[in-house]
Amino acid sequence: MEQTYVMVKPDGVERGLIGEIVAKIEKKGIKLVAGKLMQIDRTLAEQHYAEHIGKPFFEDLIGFITSGPVFAMVLEGDDVIKTARRMMGKTNPLEADPGTIRAEYAIHTNRNVIHGSDSPESAKREIQLFFEPHEILSYEKAVDTWI
């Protein structure tokens, strides 16, 4: 079963959207196997966004992601990386398809509510960055027997 990392960013947490976003994900049949509300410090933010070091928007990105709490999650399911990315929608909420999380909740490209891993490699790296192995649970959902 594939796993991915998804994070409700500070703007989503501050606007009280965690529950709605998690509900949307779970209604799709995706399993939440880890989740925690946390404050990201600069060191962790720089590790997470290492590929953007040196880019003009880097300092603003670090400032934003450390500005308030985030809700970090590990999701599990068949093709969960692709499915979660499709559910999130395009980075720019004005270009996101109707019904996607960003189309419904994001206000601006720089305040787009949610982050999700874009590949199996980034998912593995981000999960290891934000979670200890013992924090990721294995369980069966009642609906699993029907799928």
UniProtKB/Swiss-Prot annotation:
UniProt main location, coarse: cytoplasm
As cofactor, the record names: Mg(2+)
Q: Which keywords does this Swiss-Prot/TrEMBL entry list? A: ATP-binding, Cytoplasm, Kinase, Magnesium, Metal-binding, Nucleotide metabolism, Nucleotide-binding, Phosphoprotein, Transferase
Cellular component terms (Gene Ontology): cytoplasm
Listed SUPFAM superfamilies:
Nucleoside diphosphate kinase, NDK (SSF54919)
Task: List the EC numbers from the record.
Answer: 2.7.4.6
GO MF terms here are:
ATP binding; metal ion binding; nucleoside diphosphate kinase activity
Q: Which residues bind ATP?
A: 9, 57, 85, 91, 102, 112
Q: Entry's SMART domains?
A: NDK
Annotated compartments: Cytoplasm
How is this protein organized at the quaternary level? Homotetramer.
Q: What is this protein called?
A: Nucleoside diphosphate kinase
Protein source organism: Listeria innocua serovar 6a (strain ATCC BAA-680 / CLIP 11262)
* Taxonomic path: Bacteria, Bacillati, Bacillota, Bacilli, Bacillales
Q: Which gene encodes it?
A: ndk
